[in-house]
């Protein structure tokens, strides 16, 4: 895809691809996306993954949202994401917590060892 291409994220959000780099050594595309969502919240990772996978004709499980940064009150977010050629490469390179985030599963935090009966 050429740079400055538009991607519809949702009814209230639209993105513009600012940079699209093919990293042949690793086997992935590295994309910087600027998302405009005036008057609404930051789009979810699932919405972004769905829109990008449709725009680039790739499977949703091969798209990883690395970072979403939004300035307070601006209605504009910068999104860094990667599209991999295979799931094996993705799992070797990307951290597990990011894959869990994109899948919508929550990791369980350490917490106390005492459990529910810790207070006496």
Curated annotation (Swiss-Prot):
Q: Does the keyword Protease apply?
A: no
Q: Could you tell me the Gene Ontology terms of the biological process aspect for this record?
A: translation
User: Record's Gene3D superfamilies?
Assistant: 3.30.70.3370
Taxonomically, which superkingdom? Answer: Archaea
Keywords associated with the record: Ribonucleoprotein, Ribosomal protein
Listed under GO cellular component are: ribonucleoprotein complex; ribosome
Annotated segments matching region Disordered: 101-120
InterPro entries for the chain: eRP_eS24_sf, Ribosomal_eS24, Ribosomal_eS24_CS, Ribosomal_uL23/eL15/eS24_sf
Q: Which GO terms describe its molecular function?
A: structural constituent of ribosome
- Say which family it is in: Belongs to the eukaryotic ribosomal protein eS24 family.
User: Mind telling me what this protein is named?
Assistant: Small ribosomal subunit protein eS24
- Species source reads Saccharolobus islandicus (strain M.16.4 / Kamchatka #3)
Classification of source organism = Archaea, Thermoproteota, Thermoprotei, Sulfolobales, Sulfolobaceae
